[in-house]
A protein has these predicted regions:
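Short acidic-hydrophobic surface loop/beta-edge motif
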Residues: 36, 104, 142-145
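Short, functional N-terminal and low-complexity linear motifs
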Residues: 80-87, 135-140, 165, 215-216
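C-terminal amphipathic alpha-helical segment
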Residues: 115-177
């Protein structure tokens, strides 16, 4: 490694924290100006940093897919829906630009809905992990710490899914549905919690006649799948590839801007 080099950093920030990007950049540049020590050798780093909203990597992924078949993403409206454990976010891109008026990150997250429903169903905190495993695997028979035996979590599973679904449905109808007035609008659904409601979402969009305009980011690039398989956490977190799709798209976008690095 040379004693002095340039580093390019693309950072994904939650939509509500995007306003802090200048402060983050200033602080990061100040840290780099002070230099580093690596194995006793001084290192000087020149940092170039850009911040993007979480979900922009998914947009770049779709942009690349369309370009591969001769289509231009700028000719359509693209809604990126990210269903996370903390919240649900929507990014609206119109003509290739982020439209702030159609974007927000105040939708319901899976975890708050899960906790609410689990408590109402009589599940205590020591069993939260096993209830989560039941939902993720669709296998209701799981170990219960509170009961000291195998337990059928069918009723709590249904309660959690119903509670989350109703919250997502309300948000969709209030925040996303009005943006579908343009016939060239495409919706891309991702996030670690999206797989939990996959069947319900598919049935809902089919009923509305929207199935051809809604895409699920279930098929990931082979390189990403290979990368995730090498991580020890992947066995315990089946949705890890789905969770990493956004950051991987951002990484590929960054690599594509660097002439000196082979894509």
């Amino acid at each position: 490694m040379p004693p002095s080099f340039e580093a390019v950093l693309w950072l994904a920030l939650p939509l509500t924290e995007l306003g802090t990007r200048d402060a983050i950049r200033t602080q990061a540049e100040a840290i780099c100006q002070g230099g580093f020590q690596f194995r006793g050798e001084p290192l000087q780093v020149g940092l170039t940093m850009q911040a993007f909203p979480e979900g922009f990597g998914l947009y770049l992924n779709r942009k690349g897919e369309l370009e591969a078949v001769g289509q231009d993403i700028n000719q359509r409206r693209t809604l990126i829906v990210m269903m996370g454990h903390r919240n649900l976010s929507v990014l609206c891109f119109d003509g290739g630009s982020l439209r702030a008026a159609g974007s927000n990150s105040n939708g319901p997250g899976f975890w708050p809905m899960f906790e609410k429903a689990a408590r109402s169903a009589g599940v205590t905190q020591p069993d939260y992990g096993f209830l989560m495993a039941a939902i993720a695997s669709n296998q209701s028979q799981q170990l219960s710490v509170a009961r000291g035996r195998l337990f059928d979590f069918s009723e709590p599973m249904t309660a959690c899914l119903d509670t989350y679904w109703q919250a997502v449905l309300t948000y969709w109808q209030d925040q996303v549905m009005p943006q579908l007035e343009a016939v060239n609008t495409e919706v891309i659904i991702s996030g670690g919690a999206s797989s939990i409601l996959r069947s319900r979402l598919s049935a809902y969009f089919t009923e509305l006649g929207l199935s051809q305009r809604v895409l699920f980011t279930e098929v990931s690039p082979r390189r990403l799948e290979a990368l995730v398989r090498g991580l020890p956490e992947s066995a315990q977190i089946p949705s890890m590839t789905l969770r990493m799709a956004d950051s991987y798209g951002l990484f590929r976008g960054l690599i594509g801007t660097l002439d000196s690095v082979a894509v």
